[in-house]
Design a protein with these regions (language model features):
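Non-catalytic regulatory/interaction regions at protein termini and inter-domain linkers
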Residues: 1-157
Length: 157
């Protein structure tokens, strides 16, 4: 699937539900926001309500909660691609999460690859629905160098 990637070192993650995705990604997102990186979440479904619920229950200071909620958690890819384009032009460091079914991830990655071809300051994290790809997880992991877990980014061995 991602063997044709040319410019980005990619990471994968696997989730069982929207809340699970958010629990896996939030520590990493929080770290990247602390590093002043732009965080963009391209998602097949709207996560606005689930992230609000989760953020209200986690132990973070209010400023960090506000920063997390400022991220666009809705499924409006067109607006997010406009934002990616702006960030590329201004040479911002960014982390892009791509969350959804395997076909969605493949299509979004093809577009991201074209748009960010010459940009070296982009990190992409593909987040797969475990229910959909459970039989193919090993093959998918073979295409990545890292996996994202709640403990952070780990090298796949």
């Amino acid at each position: 699937m991602n063997k044709n990637q040319k410019t980005k070192e990619k990471t994968c993650a696997f989730y069982a539900s929207d809340y699970h995705f958010e629990m896996i990604s939030l520590p990493y997102i929080n770290k990247k926001l602390d590093e002043s990186k732009e965080v963009i979440v391209l998602t097949e479904n709207n996560l606005k309500e689930t992230i609000k619920t989760l953020v209200s229950k986690i132990n973070l200071n209010e400023d960090k909660k506000v920063d997390i909620l400022k991220i666009d958690w809705e499924n409006n890819d067109l607006n997010k691609f406009k934002k990616i384009n702006e960030d590329i032009k201004s040479k911002k460091d960014m982390v892009i999460f791509v969350k959804g079914k395997e076909n969605y991830i493949k299509n979004i990655n093809e577009t991201i690859e074209k748009w960010t071809e010459k940009s070296k300051n982009v990190e992409i994290i593909d987040c797969y629905d475990m229910e959909e790809i459970s039989q193919d997880m090993d093959n998918i992991m073979d295409q990545y160098k890292f996996t994202l877990k709640t403990t952070g980014k780990n090298i796949i061995k």
